[in-house]
C-alpha cells in the first residue's frame, strides 16, 4: 500500500466503521510478506461464532495509464493478497473463519476492478 488518497480513505473508513463491532481493522499490517492494505481480523475472542475474515488489497493507476497497466496492477494485487494470506499473522488472526481476499484497482477516480479471489 501507499499513502491514502480520497477513494482509498473512503473505502477504508467504511470498512472500519461498518465492521468495527465485529472486526479489528488492521491497516498497513506489517507481515513477513510486506504490507496488507486492510486486514479485517475477526474478534473471535468476543464473537467466537464468526464465519468470515477479509483481506482487501487496493491498487491505483493514473487516469492516463493504459488498460495494460490496470491489468498489471490487478495481477500484482492478487499476488500480494495471496502472499499475505499465507503469513503467520493472518493465519493466526483468521482462526477458523473463511478468509475472503478482495482486490480493488482504481484508474483515476474510477473503480476498474473489484473482485474476490
Regions found by a protein language model. Name each.
Residues 1-6, 10-11:
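Single conserved hydrophobic/aromatic residue that forms the stacking wall/gate
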Residues 69-115:
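Nucleic-acid nuclease catalytic cores
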